[in-house]
Every structure is written in structure tokens, then in C-alpha cells.
Regions:
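Walker A/P-loop nucleotide-binding motif
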Residues: 116-135
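Pre-Walker A (pre-P-loop) alpha-helix and adjacent loop at the N terminus of AAA/AAA+ ATPase modules
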Residues: 90-120
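Loop/turn-to-beta-strand initiation segments
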Residues: 118, 153, 187-190, 221-227
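A short, basic N-terminal segment
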Residues: 1-99, 271-273
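GG-anchored amphipathic helix commonly corresponding to the ABC/SMC/Rad50 NBD signature/C-loop
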Residues: 135-141
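Short glycine-rich substrate-engagement loop in P-loop NTPases that contacts/grips substrate
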Residues: 99-105, 142-187
């Protein structure tokens, strides 16, 4: 500490601060390897320190807010590496229905950006681009809300992988316990569920009831859930009309989705081939 002792010395000058009316101090400080003597007002310096602390606090608040909102998408989404590289910009329009689909998603963009509340559903056969569209929308909304300085928490989750991870958590702590995932998926501002219905098996009633209970817990505590599925509306009602659901779960799935459902024709070709 001895080598810094010289920098703690100060001399009170006759000069007066025009703002605070107090005497200036002459202090010695190291600047770029040299000891420089400068004049400063102690009250001005206090104000500078307070402004600096306020700025640090603001930056800390922004980082904390982004951690709870914008960063959720990249940190907590459950998505394949192949799909994670997709966006709405690289969605290829091959037939008329593709253009209708992209226009539907763009309408969802505008509505959700304006504060619209309610679910949305995209349904159709495998391979028509449902996951690409919904992931692209999730990615776009996440960036859009940040650009408005109103970041939201947006989460995209593969339903099949989600339940695989929850089942794995019964054997070891993988960070995907049922309680943790229900809480996370219930609380995000926008939840995208990829391939809803794939978590269920026709012949496994006990497994289905467990899975349906989890889906119900999630949807019962939230709005703004965007779903893609291979199931038609009638198939959704049939699948989730078990002893537990009794129609309540399918009601949660369709909640607020009037006018926000898009259906691909059943005979469409798989885009992946």
C-alpha cells in the first residue's frame, strides 16, 4: 500500500466550483504510467460516482431482465440442432399452401406483437414444414420483442424430447425434473410446443394419463401457446378425452385459438424428401 500513499494526498485550492460553491482539490493520480496533478470538485466527483453506480445498476437490471426473458430461448429451448438453424427467411415456398402458411405465421407475428392473447395451432401431416414455421416464428418473436426494448420469454420445446428428459430425471438428476419443467413451461410468455400428441401411445393408458396430466398442468396456467401437431381437431379431442382430461385438456389446447388455426391438406407430400 505504501507505493499508493502519494495518490491519497490532496491540497485544498483557493479556486471555487461554480456549481457547488466549494473549494477545489488538487490531487495526484496515475495516468498512463505518469503521475498527473488535477483539480477537481469533491461534490462533482461524488455526483460522478453516483451516476456511475446508477449506470451499473441499470446495466445489471437489463442483464437480469434479459436472462429471464430474451436469453431463455437459446438457453432453455429443447430443439434439434438441425431445426435450430432454421428461420422464417429460409422457409421455401414450393406450392400455394406454403405461401398461405407463411402468411398465417406473419399474421401471428403482428397479432402477438400487438399484445394479442390466445393460443394458435398449426396442424397437418408429417414433413410439411410445421416445425420449421413454428420455430421460425418463435425465433423471430424473441428478436422482435428485444428490438422493441420489451423482451419476452419465448420457449420452443419438442414435446417428445421433453417427456424423454422428464422420464430420464426419474433415474438421475439431469436438470429436467417434472416440477422444474412444469414451472418453466407454465411461466414463459410464449410457449411453442412441437409435435403435440407424439407424447401419447394408443395402447398405453397409464403412460398417457401421466403425460396428459403434465400437459394439463402447463396449459392450465398460461396463455399464448403456439402448437404444431399431426392431429386434426377431432383427433385432439379424442386423444385427450381420457379419464383425466374429460375434455378439459382439449379445451385448454384450443383456448383462444379461434381464427388462429392453420390446417395443411392431408395429402401433402413430405418436404424432406
Amino acid at each position: 500500500m505504501k507505493q499508493f500513499k502519494q495518490f491519497r494526498t490532496r491540497t485544498v485550492l483557493d479556486d471555487i466550483c461554480e456549481i457547488h460553491g466549494c473549494h477545489l482539490w488538487s490531487v495526484k493520480i496515475p495516468i498512463r504510467g505518469k503521475v498527473e496533478e488535477i483539480s477537481q470538485c469533491p461534490e462533482c466527483e461524488k455526483e460522478n460516482i453516483r451516476r456511475f453506480e446508477k449506470q451499473l445498476n441499470m446495466e445489471s437490471e437489463v442483464k437480469s431482465k434479459l436472462s429471464d426473458t430474451y436469453e431463455v430461448f437459446a438457453r432453455d429451448s429443447i430443439v434439434s440442432s438441425k431445426l435450430a438453424s432454421k428461420s422464417l427467411h429460409d422457409y421455401e415456398i414450393r406450392v400455394d399452401i406454403d405461401e398461405n402458411a407463411i402468411n398465417f405465421v406473419k399474421r401471428l407475428e403482428r397479432e402477438y406483437a400487438k399484445g394479442t392473447v390466445g393460443n394458435a395451432i398449426i396442424t397437418g401431416p408429417s414433413g410439411v414444414g410445421k416445425s420449421h414455421l413454428t420455430y421460425g416464428l418463435a425465433r423471430f418473436l424473441n428478436e422482435q420483442f428485444k428490438s422493441y426494448d420489451e423482451p419476452k420469454s419465448v420457449l420452443f420445446v419438442s414435446v417428445v424430447t421433453l417427456f424423454d428428459k422428464i422420464r430420464e430425471s426419474f433415474e438421475f438428476d439431469n436438470g429436467y425434473s417434472e416440477a422444474k419443467m412444469v414451472k418453466l413451461l407454465s411461466e414463459v410468455d410464449f410457449l411453442f410446443l412441437d409435435d403435440l400428441g407424439k407424447e401419447s401411445r394408443k395402447a398405453d393408458t397409464k403412460r398417457n394419463e401421466w403425460a396428459h396430466q403434465i400437459v394439463f398442468k402447463i396449459l392450465d396456467n398460461r396463455t399464448n401457446t403456439i402448437i404444431n401437431t399431426n392431429l386434426s381437431s377431432e383427433e385432439i379431442k379424442e386423444l385427450y378425452a381420457d379419464d383425466f382430461g374429460n375434455g378439459a385438456l382439449s379445451s385448454r389446447i384450443f383456448e383462444g385459438a379461434t381464427g388462429r388455426c392453420f390446417v395443411y391438406p392431408s395429402g401433402m407430400k413430405d418436404r424432406r424428401y
